[in-house]
Amino acid sequence: MTITVVSTFHAPVLSLYGQRFVNSFSENIDADIKLRLYAEDCNPVTKDPRIQILDAKQKLPKLNAFKSTWGNVPKANGKCPPEIKARRPKDWHKEFKWDAVRFANKVYAVFDAAQHCNTDWIVWMDADTFVHSKFDYAAFKSFLPERSWLAYMGRGRKWPECGFYGINLKNPVGLEFLKEFEHVYEHAEYGIFRMEEWHDSYVFDEVLKKIKRKYPNEPINNISGNLVNGEGHPIINSGLGAYIDHLKGDRKSVGKSNKPKDLIKPRNESYWTN
């Protein structure tokens, strides 16, 4: 089974965490797993032949078109529309929930990789990930069961954690999910903007619900097991935490998840105990 990891970042974060992600991937992830990285206005450095660095602006024309159409439209850039604001008095000010343009960088990288990678699985991994321990092929593959069409981080009733997910490109349901996922972005006015929120995780969840209704018996691997407590930081509290850290929010400036409530599951890996 072949596996290709996909990620993207832009110039402002290269020195903060982007280059560190590339270095940790090269050092700790099995040599049989590839990385396809879309870099925007920056030049990450690596001598690792399995890491392919692409110019995001050149390789993602659909993303460019999306930004051209929606880049100056307030509702697509974090400004909650009045009709939603009226029924969301507690969270309308949380701009990330309606910032479609910001999070489109992630999804269009996935769409492009799915079309151009000759691989069995594509795995999205946020670039604010740090691979802290050796992650061999068998361990990585264990999160991607061959019979499953999707591996993801569920959070119960909340939208999934989309810092890590895998799609089986050899499974027709996985391909249908990708097709629908891209469709709601390519036809955004009647797609994502008909939803209640339009950050990538919410859109992912809406498409996932639709596909699950259509194929209720097709296997999916929920890596997190629907964590109820600590659902804000599920990656490090799942099996993935033995290998990677996810530097969400202001953890990026610290370089490690070290908040008191980050780990709800005791870990004995040296990265976490030192």
Pin down the residues of each PLM region.
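Short beta-alpha junction loops
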Residues: 39-44, 129, 155-156
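Conserved catalytic core of nucleotide-sugar-dependent glycosyltransferases
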Residues: 132-201
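N-terminal anchoring/stem segment of glycosyltransferases
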Residues: 1-92, 115-118, 169-172, 247-254, ...
